[in-house]
Amino acid sequence: MASLWCGNLLRLGSGLSMSCLALSVLLLAQLTGAAKNFEDVRCKCICPPYKENPGHIYNKNISQKDCDCLHVVEPMPVRGPDVEAYCLRCECKYEERSSVTIKVTIIIYLSILGLLLLYMVYLTLVEPILKRRLFGHSQLLQSDDDVGDHQPFANAHDVLARSRSRANVLNKVEYAQQRWKLQVQEQRKSVFDRHVVLS
């Protein structure tokens, strides 16, 4: 029974890791497509509406010294003397970014998310099995006490040694949760008692 659960868990875990890998590849492909639209170094000019011309955003891959309205805005929407007035309204900024750093950050984030998802599935599938085993050992310990008094501690010692050796993170987490729940109940009770006393 346990080997069946472990086999299912491994199949599910490998499926999840493959889906996370596929999602990472898909995201990288989209980022590469987006990188074609916007270079890592660019000049961006935001021009507000002027007379009958609507506002517009212009991007161009040029050097920092040429990052101004006259070099970036093409085609110029106004002619003649209005060009200078139009360019004074435009706000141009030189931008640099590292698309490689962005890609690596996203891959690390997705990897951590995939590992956490895999750990959650592990806890969901394996925790009931561990609880059944520990519950079975406690029943065995009780039945050994009921059977007889010849060597009452020999079997109990073996069962306790096996259950202690299997103590893991899940048991510690469950103990911490139970302790926290008891503390919350005690706090609620003390708050309620104080409220009754004050009334």
From Swiss-Prot:
UniProt keyword list: Endosome, Glycoprotein, Lysosome, Membrane, Phosphoprotein, Signal, Transmembrane, Transmembrane helix
Signal peptide (from-to): 1-34
Entry membrane topology: Single-pass membrane protein
Modifications after synthesis and translation: N-glycosylated.
Modified residues (Phosphoserine): 143, 190
Database matches in InterPro entries: TMEM9/TMEM9B
Domain of life where this protein originates: Eukaryota
Any one Pfam family match given in the protein's UniProt record, by short name: Tmemb_9
Residues annotated as glycosylated: 61
A cellular-component GO term for this protein: early endosome membrane
Keyword match GTP-binding: no
Transmembrane segments: 106-126
Location(s), subcellular: Lysosome membrane; Early endosome membrane
Family: Belongs to the TMEM9 family.
Function: Enhances production of pro-inflammatory cytokines induced by TNF, IL1B, and TLR ligands. Has a role in TNF activation of both the NF-kappaB and MAPK pathways.
Protein name (record): Transmembrane protein 9B
Encoding gene, per UniProt annotation: Tmem9b
